[in-house]
Structure formats: structure tokens, C-alpha cells
């Protein structure tokens, strides 16, 4: 198969879809790989690193799209990239379609087949291609929250860990999944007073068993959320409904109940955000203020640590990339129903029901058992 990797063009996105090691694996298996010049530069890989492993370096994204059967990226294709997609293309990347009708319609209109990292599953019902970036974003969230809390940035002027004789900051983490537990671990490690809320009792039991000595946990009732939010210095939004738009946990009206200068870090912003007042920001302009409350809503947080993020993502995606390249998407998805769960768009149709429900678009997913007859 002809595999292509363009340079990411989302603002301040420094990750890359393929590492030189991934190129080596693909080339050794008889596939050709085309990489846009400087695609890996932000993650610490130069063109010669890719050339040594057998990649063909080209000067533009258009050349990558023109040559490739499968396009491997990190972030959702931007408008100019979507114009280069066509029927016969296989796109493998993060998509986050539920809050993005424009991208969804463009992908449908392109006729491409699009498999989203964030909806690929595993035997335990987990999200193996979302997990590594959730770990990174979760661990970054307290750092970004601590920065946002600084007075010069509009925050409360509270040090996360406090000092002897002065209480530490109170951190509320909404959601006890991969993002939430990683955020809570780091915040607790920085000395903060941390509470994690979740609605899953089994998850709360796990958190209590594993992390009970580090931070508190509680059931995420509306009353508990409101009370703890009103006392918090930093609130980290870490909820996820796979492939669907994130639920709104703090309304605009509730901002008046928070302490002035409270920092909100919305890790769920890729899926629309879990605070009503959230809107996507960039690393260049990451925070904004509404009613005295500071919001940090960078949509590609792991891009700030591109080297770590690229290596972690590559470790997770490579087995799936190899399977897709070796077998083609139909056989690969037929053999692996968890990869099939990643199918979001195919042949001019939306195929992921949670996105259809969020956007009011009819979905038509092929039957898994009938994949072998597709062409």
C-alpha cells in the first residue's frame, strides 16, 4: 500500500503521524511511504531520519495526498486538507466529529473512508488510541491550571501546592477516567488538595483502591459538583462519552457561584467541551476570561509536548497502521471488530451513530459480518 504522512497544519500542532521507526516497519513489509518535508521537525525528527528508513520526502501536502492510498495524521484534517481527500482515500487520524458539522459534511462529500483513532476500541471496552493522548493531556492539565492560576494570567494567585502555613489549592477533577486519574495524580504530586468526581461506582472503587492515599473521590451528583466547584481554585474537565459530544457539567449561570479567578481547564474541548462557556483556544492564545473565571481550552494540549506525544501515539497506532496497510481496510476491519468501531465515514455516508445523534445526520454503518462483500 502507498502510505502518506503530511505535516500537521493545525495551529501550534507539532506532532507527526508517523515516526521513522514506523516508516521502517512499513517499508520492510513492502509498502511505500511518502512524507511531507519537515513533517516530523516539531517532534525532533528531520527529513533524513525518514529517508534513512526508506521514505520518499516530497515538498507539499498535495503531493502526499496525490500519491497515497492511506493518509496517516494526528489531528483532524483542516479545510484545505479536506479538499485534497477523494474517493479511494483511507484517512486514519483523530477526527472528533461530534462537535464539528463542517468537517463531518466535508468528509462525507469527499467519498473517503475515515477511521477515527478516538473510537477504536479494545477487548475491555477501552479506547487504546485515545488513551496515550489522554494520559499526556491529563498530566499536562494541572501544569496548565497552575499557570492559569497565576495572578499575571488573571487567576486567583494561588500556588497549587501551597507552602508551610498556607493551604494548598483545591483541585476538582470532573471525570475519573484516564484523563482524570492522570490529572489527579499529578495535581496531588504537586501538593494540591484533590477531589475526583465520577458517576461510575465501579470506577470510584478502583480509584479508591489504587489512589485512595493520594486524593479524595466522590459521586458526581449535581449537588456535589456545584458545592465542590464553588470551593475549588482549579477545575479540570475530564469527561468523555466515546465519539459523542461532551456533556456540559458547569453552566454559564454557575460561573457566578465560583470564586473570582478560578481556573477551568477543559480537556474535553475536542469533543465540544464540558463547560457551557468553553470554546477552543490555541497554544498561542490559550486562556480567556468570562465573568471573572479563567478558561484554558486548548484543543490539542498534547501538541505542546510533541516528542513525548508522538512517540506515545506511535506506539499505539502502529499495529493498526500495519494491519490496514497489509490487509486493506475492509479485511483489517473484518478481522478486528475493534478497529471496525473506528469507522466514522465511508462512501459518502456517516457511519458512527453517536456523531449522527449529535449532528442530526442519518447514519448507515455497514454490517460487520458483511464487510467481505464491500468493494
Predicted regions and their residues:
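Glycine/serine-rich phosphate-binding loop and adjoining beta1-alpha1 elements at the start
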Residues: 2, 8, 79-169, 298-300
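An N-terminal-biased, well-structured beta-alpha scaffold segment characteristic
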Residues: 2-110
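Glycine-rich phosphate/diphosphate-binding loop of Rossmann-like nucleotide-binding domains
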Residues: 6-45, 152-240, 287
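Short acidic-hydrophobic, aromatic-tinged amphipathic segments that line or gate anion-handling sites
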Residues: 56-61, 115, 216-221
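Short glycine-/small-residue-rich Rossmann-like dinucleotide-binding loops
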Residues: 69, 75-76, 95-96, 221, ...
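Residue-level detector of alpha-helix initiation sites
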Residues: 76, 136, 177-178
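Adenosine-phosphate binding glycine-rich loop
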Residues: 118-144, 148-159, 269, 274-375
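Rossmann-like adenosine-cofactor binding region
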Residues: 209-291
Amino acid at each position: 500500500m502507498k502510505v502518506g504522512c503530511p505535516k500537521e497544519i493545525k495551529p501550534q500542532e507539532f506532532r507527526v503521524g508517523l515516526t521513522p521507526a514506523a516508516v521502517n516497519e512499513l517499508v520492510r513489509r513492502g509498502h511505500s511511504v511518502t512524507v511531507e518535508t519537515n513533517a516530523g521537525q516539531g517532534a525532533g525528527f528531520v527529513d533524513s531520519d525518514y529517508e534513512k528508513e526508506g521514505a520518499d520526502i516530497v515538498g507539499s501536502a498535495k503531493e502526499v495526498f496525490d500519491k497515497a492510498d492511506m493518509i496517516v495524521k494526528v489531528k483532524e484534517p483542516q479545510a484545505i486538507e479536506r479538499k485534497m481527500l477523494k474517493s479511494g482515500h483511507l484517512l486514519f487520524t483523530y477526527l472528533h466529529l461530534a462537535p464539528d458539522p463542517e468537517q463531518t459534511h466535508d468528509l462525507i462529500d469527499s467519498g473517503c473512508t475515515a477511521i477515527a483513532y478516538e473510537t477504536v476500541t479494545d477487548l475491555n471496552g477501552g479506547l487504546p488510541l485515545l488513551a496515550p493522548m489522554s494520559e499526556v493531556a491529563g498530566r499536562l492539565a494541572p501544569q496548565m491550571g497552575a499557570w492559569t492560576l497565576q495572578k499575571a494570567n488573571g487567576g486567583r494567585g494561588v500556588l497549587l501546592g501551597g507552602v508551610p502555613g498556607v493551604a494548598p489549592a483545591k483541585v476538582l477533577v470532573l471525570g475519573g477516567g484516564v484523563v482524570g486519574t492522570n490529572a489527579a495524580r499529578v495535581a496531588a504530586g504537586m501538593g494540591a488538595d484533590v477531589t475526583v468526581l465520577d458517576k461510575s461506582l465501579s470506577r470510584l472503587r478502583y480509584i479508591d483502591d489504587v489512589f485512595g492515599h493520594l486524593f479524595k473521590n466522590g459521586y458526581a451528583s449535581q449537588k456535589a459538583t456545584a458545592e465542590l466547584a464553588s470551593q475549588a481554585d482549579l477545575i479540570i474537565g475530564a469527561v468523555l462519552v466515546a465519539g459523542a459530544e461532551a456533556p456540559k457539567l458547569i453552566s454559564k449561570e454557575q460561573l457566578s457561584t465560583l470564586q473570582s479567578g478560578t481556573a477551568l481547564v477543559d480537556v474535553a474541548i475536542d469533543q465540544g467541551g464540558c463547560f457551557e462557556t468553553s470554546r477552543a483556544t490555541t497554544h498561542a492564545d490559550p486562556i480567556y476570561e468570562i465573568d471573572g473565571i479563567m478558561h484554558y481550552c486548548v484543543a490539542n494540549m498534547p501538541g505542546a509536548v510533541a516528542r513525548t506525544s508522538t512517540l506515545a501515539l506511535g506506539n499505539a497506532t502502529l499495529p493498526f497502521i500495519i494491519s490496514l496497510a497489509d490487509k486493506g481496510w475492509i479485511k483489517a476491519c473484518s478481522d478486528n471488530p475493534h478497529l471496525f468501531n473506528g469507522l466514522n465515514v465511508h462512501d459518502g455516508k456517516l457511519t458512527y451513530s453517536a456523531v449522527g445523534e449529535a449532528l442530526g445526520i442519518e447514519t448507515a454503518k455497514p454490517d460487520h459480518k458483511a464487510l467481505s462483500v464491500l468493494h
